[in-house]
Regions:
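Short, conserved DNA-binding cores of transcription-related domains
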Residues: 1-90
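Short, positively charged, Gly/Tyr-enriched micro-motifs
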Residues: 1, 63-161
């Protein structure tokens, strides 16, 4: 039984293989629209096809499982521009990213504000937020200032977190 002052160890402590971590909870998220405005000319564009994207989000601390967002999105075709485009998901995650903005923000904050090195920051994200992020990914985010695809400012190699 849990109580004040009683230590309950993390059941995942000591796991060295990522595949042994608890399975994620899948949360369905829909951005599949029949029509949407074209970002170039603002004309209504009809849905061309649908797709799915898997995003890792901050986990559920009550169940101890990570949370994965399964985002159903639509791809559209504009007759006027003759261009294809996907529905905008930039409020959830950067283009091409596997993690949500919330995960990226927490990871960069843990390293830059709390001063944790990258490997302990990776463990901290798992222990306190139930999201597994490889330490090299955290390093890339910190060196890019939290922006995917951006370059480190001024130097070739950042010394932050080392």
């Amino acid at each position: 039984m849990y109580g004040p002052g009683r230590y309950e160890p993390d059941p995942t402590e000591g796991i060295t293989n990522v595949k042994d971590l608890p399975a994620p909870q899948l949360v369905a998220y829909h951005r599949d629209h029949k029509q949407t405005a074209c970002p170039r000319c603002s004309q209504l564009a009809s849905r061309h096809k649908s797709g799915q994207r898997l995003l890792h989000d901050l986990g559920d601390l009550c169940t101890g499982h990570p949370v994965d967002l399964l985002v159903a999105y639509s791809s559209h075709y504009c007759d006027r521009c003759t261009k294809h485009f996907n529905i905008d998901l930039s409020d959830l995650a950067p283009p091409g990213a596997h993690y949500t903005h919330r995960v990226i923000d927490v990871a960069v904050r843990v390293v830059s504000e709390d001063g944790l090195p990258y490997r302990p920051a990776s463990w901290h994200l798992w222990r306190d937020h139930r999201v597994f992020v490889p330490f090299a990914t955290i390093q890339n985010w910190v060196e890019a200032g939290g922006k995917k695809g951006a370059r480190a400012h001024g130097r070739r190699v950042s010394r932050v977190g080392t």
